[in-house]
A protein has these predicted regions:
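Anionic-ligand binding patches
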Residues: 2-5, 11-35, 39-214
Length: 214
């Protein structure tokens, strides 16, 4: 049996990762067993001090791999808005300070975009994934993006974070445009940054199962 630890305490992000990885088997039929930080019995927190998504994903994956003595996977992702010079970027999960929840961060972002015309509201989600071996060395790193636009008000009941105001370019022509929060999980996975990155990860693991060797 192959084991993989997921280095995230974000339950909604973790649910997406588990959905995309769930049921995976290696070429020899070996099932992949996923483990979460909840199993540690203690808080797992890593200071995200790197200036980019790749660096922060590496920090988290290496820390959990060394802590567990197993292979660990980390995802660092966020939203970059062109009119805000790339903000919130690596601060996406902490934008506006610790007093704000997901909804509060989204409201703040949309307030900052109030004067930005519709044609200038371009943005992209980025997902960087890093796989580290038990000694903390990087075994695989992938990064993917989803280009889109920011609406003026949130819509949709699904997703999390900035999903209710982000429309992927693939769904921008719909009337009305469909945000990530409007999409069912399977449809979102086909175009999202995380869906693209996880498919690349899965392909790599299927091609080389030694990446999961403890």
């Amino acid at each position: 049996m192959a084991h993989l630890w997921l280095a995230t305490g974000n339950r909604k992000k973790r649910a997406e990762m588990e959905r995309l990885l769930g049921g995976m088997r290696l070429p020899d039929g070996t099932p992949l067993t996923l483990h979460t930080v909840d199993e540690l019995g203690e808080p797992f927190e890593v200071a995200e001090t790197e200036p980019d998504f790749r660096g922060n994903a590496r920090l988290k994956a290496a820390a959990l791999a060394q802590l567990t003595g197993a292979v660990a996977l980390a995802d660092d992702s966020g939203l970059s808005v062109d009119a805000l010079h790339g903000r919130p970027g690596v601060l996406s999960a902490r934008y506006g300070g610790p007093g704000l929840d997901d909804r509060g961060r989204l409201v703040r972002l949309l307030q900052e975009l109030e004067q930005v015309p519709d044609g200038k509201r371009t943005a992209r989600f980025t997902c960087s994934i890093c796989l580290c071996g038990p000694d903390g060395t990087v075994r695989l790193a992938v990064e993917e993006h989803c280009e889109g636009l920011m609406l003026r008000a949130p819509q949709g009941a699904g997703g999390f974070g900035y999903d209710p105001a982000f429309v992927a370019l693939e769904h921008a022509a719909a009337v009305p445009p469909r945000t990530f929060a409007d999409l069912d999980p399977a449809t979102k996975d086909t175009v999202s940054h995380r869906g693209k990155a996880m498919r690349r990860l899965l392909a790599a693991l299927q091609a080389d199962s030694s990446l999961l060797r403890a």
